[in-house]
């Protein structure tokens, strides 16, 4: 119980610095549906070097943040913030997973072998190296979308009613639950069930605040059960 109380106090302190930033951001986040059938642990993906298939059940008991990423996007700077998020919340059980995709404005044009060098020397550049796992480039929407993204999208309402400019979106057929752009995010809980979905323009600091708020609520529930 002492550990749960300590975790709750730490989360409260972290949240205190982000309350003011959360106002007006509610529409940038959607809670996922209740009564979801199945879990993310039924799926997995190949690492960016193609050398290892990682079943997502490896992350059982962790909070997992799924992010579709791109190297030549106006939001590519989020990589730096995601590194900071991973480092800060890893002690609380957060794991970030990145999935390169070229379906939005053709902003991830390179081969898998080119993505890490691009991040290091071009964008964000400056020797940047992600501290979270990246997987092989693939589709998140359309006929060839990765199956775990089908599961995530069907589990959570879309973050916007509009898909965007059709000449910058490269998949068919287009569906209401589709991901709108690079750097949209899904949070999956320790039980493998999706919890939240964020619009791509939601700041990482607000994503962080939402995650901490949820963790704090869960920690409080754990204390009450004791």
From Swiss-Prot:
Q: Which SUPFAM superfamilies match?
A: Thioredoxin-like
User: Example GO biological process term?
Assistant: response to lipid hydroperoxide
Q: What does this protein do?
A: Protects cells and enzymes from oxidative damage, by catalyzing the reduction of hydrogen peroxide, lipid peroxides and organic hydroperoxide, by glutathione.
Organism lineage string? Eukaryota, Metazoa, Chordata, Craniata, Vertebrata
Q: Where is the signal peptide?
A: 1-20
Q: Give the location in the cell.
A: Secreted
PANTHER family cross-referenced by the UniProt entry: GLUTATHIONE PEROXIDASE, GLUTATHIONE PEROXIDASE 3
Active site (catalytic residues): 73
Q: Which Pfam families match?
A: GSHPx
Q: Which family does it belong to?
A: Belongs to the glutathione peroxidase family.
Its tissue distribution reads: Secreted in plasma.
Record keywords? Oxidoreductase, Peroxidase, Secreted, Selenocysteine, Signal
Record's Gene Ontology CC terms?
A: extracellular exosome; extracellular region; extracellular space
**Which post-translational modifications are recorded for this protein?**
The N-terminus is blocked.
**EC no.?**
1.11.1.9
Which reactions does this protein catalyse? Answer: 2 glutathione + H2O2 = glutathione disulfide + 2 H2O; tert-butyl hydroperoxide + 2 glutathione = tert-butanol + glutathione disulfide + H2O
How does the annotation summarize its subunit structure? Homotetramer.
Q: Does the keyword Transferase apply?
A: no
In Swiss-Prot or TrEMBL terms, this protein is called Glutathione peroxidase 3
> Which organism does this sequence originate in?
Homo sapiens (Human)
The family database entries (CDD domains) matched by this protein are listed as:
GSH_Peroxidase (cd00340)
